[in-house]
Amino acid sequence: MLSALLIRNIRNASKLASVAGPNSDRIVNVKWSDGKTGVFPLIWLRDTSPDPSTYTISPAMTARKLTMLEFDVEQNARKLWIDEDANCLKIEWESGVLSEFPSEWLKIRNPSDQEARRRRRKVYLFPEQTWGKAEIEGKLKKFSHEEFMKNEQVVHDFLQAVCIDGIAVLKGAPQGVRGAVEAIGDRIGMIKRTHFGLVFEVSLKADASNMAYASNGGLPFHTDFPSLSHPPQLQMLHMLQSAEEGGHSLFVDGFHVAEQLRVEKPEIFKILTTQSMEYIEEGYDVHEINGKTIRFDYDMCARHKVIRLNDDGKVNKIQFGNAMRSWFYDCEPSKVQDVYRAMKTFTEYCYQPRNMLKFRLEDGDTVLWANQRLLHTRDGFRNAPEKARTLTGCYFDWDIVKSRVRFLRDKLSLEQNQPSA
């Protein structure tokens, strides 16, 4: 379903005026009454035909019936014409299938329209809006926990903020009540299980399996689980009991830092985007599963570049955790010194005041952030007597979070909604 506003805008200028082709390149040219034109590959029109023999469309599933093994990619049209009464393009194919393409359908999907292509790329919920302290301080998006739990528009807006800024906060859950993480997780979708379980607790422990549990001192900036080949993409923490003093949350946008290094320290940027680091994590954690205490032993090992680029050279992942960094460097010994200099410079940039966001989670607050974009830490703290600083948390993957955003855009008929087929 498209938003009513988008449909109305398109309909106002979507009267089909003419159709020509297919030409020798198997292209069909369409013109609308507003002067806009469309260039449609003939085979694409057959493949995307919105008819029951081509697609199964139901509340439970949208899927193409055609199989590529049997699909004739050279098939032709017997005839094509504009049905003026229905304002649609009709094509009768050699196979006997009749396709009907409404004017709005064609305009939204017009492969030769740069605006249509730009709009479609937004379905991936990129690009991010990177930030330093000046851009995010005082502008961090915060939402009511109560409204999040009962209003799907707030769920959408909260998750959309995380997609854009990489972070957002829920305020005011019932204080000291366990189960908030699970309840929020149910509103978002499926929580991602790790070797720390489905939902974990962060507090000081004598037999700590993680640096966050081992000391009340400050921690270094890091992303979680660089020791995994596929680290969780988002992390959430809920404050059950805050510290009497200290324990502030600190975040830095790794994408923003990477772009600073690209401009200011290109030699450092090159090392961090080409040299993989090895991370290890050995130990055990204890889980309660179906009323039984289960010890899970693990020996994790993975390699990541600190800054990963996509095919277009854009930063799309940050992965760094000094506590889990191993001794192994898969490069010539003469290059190791430069690798250390690069890690040092990256870390110093993270700690520059211009890059850091600092705030305090109060009891009942929850923060969700992009674990492969933002680095996080906390400063040292002091507990009140008999009131240990305690958080619960979990992880998510982007597929679940972004699926929820797209689903709600469809369900709520929001302006940003886009067709699935």
UniProtKB/Swiss-Prot annotation:
<protein>
    <recommendedName>
        <fullName>Probable gamma-butyrobetaine dioxygenase</fullName>
        <ecNumber>1.14.11.1</ecNumber>
    </recommendedName>
</protein>
<keyword id="KW-0223">Dioxygenase</keyword>
<dbReference type="InterPro" id="IPR042098">
    <property type="entry name" value="TauD-like_sf"/>
</dbReference>
<feature type="binding site">
    <location>
        <position position="224"/>
    </location>
    <ligand>
        <name>Fe cation</name>
    </ligand>
</feature>
<dbReference type="Pfam" id="PF02668">
    <property type="entry name" value="TauD"/>
</dbReference>
<keyword id="KW-0479">Metal-binding</keyword>
<comment type="similarity">
    <text>Belongs to the gamma-BBH/TMLD family.</text>
</comment>
<keyword id="KW-0560">Oxidoreductase</keyword>
<dbReference type="InterPro" id="IPR003819">
    <property type="entry name" value="TauD/TfdA-like"/>
</dbReference>
<comment type="function">
    <text>Catalyzes the formation of L-carnitine from gamma-butyrobetaine.</text>
</comment>
<dbReference type="GO" id="GO:0045329">
    <property type="term" value="P:carnitine biosynthetic process"/>
</dbReference>
<feature type="binding site">
    <location>
        <position position="376"/>
    </location>
    <ligand>
        <name>Fe cation</name>
    </ligand>
</feature>
<dbReference type="GO" id="GO:0005506">
    <property type="term" value="F:iron ion binding"/>
</dbReference>
<dbReference type="GO" id="GO:0008336">
    <property type="term" value="F:gamma-butyrobetaine dioxygenase activity"/>
</dbReference>
<feature type="binding site">
    <location>
        <position position="222"/>
    </location>
    <ligand>
        <name>Fe cation</name>
    </ligand>
</feature>
<comment type="pathway">
    <text>Amine and polyamine biosynthesis; carnitine biosynthesis.</text>
</comment>
<dbReference type="GO" id="GO:0005739">
    <property type="term" value="C:mitochondrion"/>
</dbReference>
<dbReference type="InterPro" id="IPR050411">
    <property type="entry name" value="AlphaKG_dependent_hydroxylases"/>
</dbReference>
<keyword id="KW-0124">Carnitine biosynthesis</keyword>
<dbReference type="InterPro" id="IPR038492">
    <property type="entry name" value="GBBH-like_N_sf"/>
</dbReference>
<dbReference type="InterPro" id="IPR012775">
    <property type="entry name" value="GBBH-like"/>
</dbReference>
<keyword id="KW-0408">Iron</keyword>
